[in-house]
Amino acid sequence: MNSVLVTSACVEFRATLARHIKPLQREDPERHSLEWFFLRYLKRVAERAHASPSAREVNGAMRGLTRFYVDSVTHNAVLTARFEDVLAAHRHALRAEQSAQ
């Protein structure tokens, strides 16, 4: 049963990423804007998340997104909400994966 929790947590994490990537893509942010870089980091995380069933495999990309957020985005309320949602989903997936072991 624990493997189902890990799988569903990873699926939820991937869905969270898609939920934030799609609207940003539709907005077509200006090149080199905060939104453009944020979208690039989200896409990198999504690529890693879809390549592996393990949430741990995404840690490096999440660290990159976190560093970008801390350095650049902290004063943008919309991107802050997006970042916090993605981070919470990743942490949930990690906890579910760890409890399965």
PLM feature segments, named:
Residues 23-34, 50-55, 73-77:
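Charged, low-complexity interaction regions
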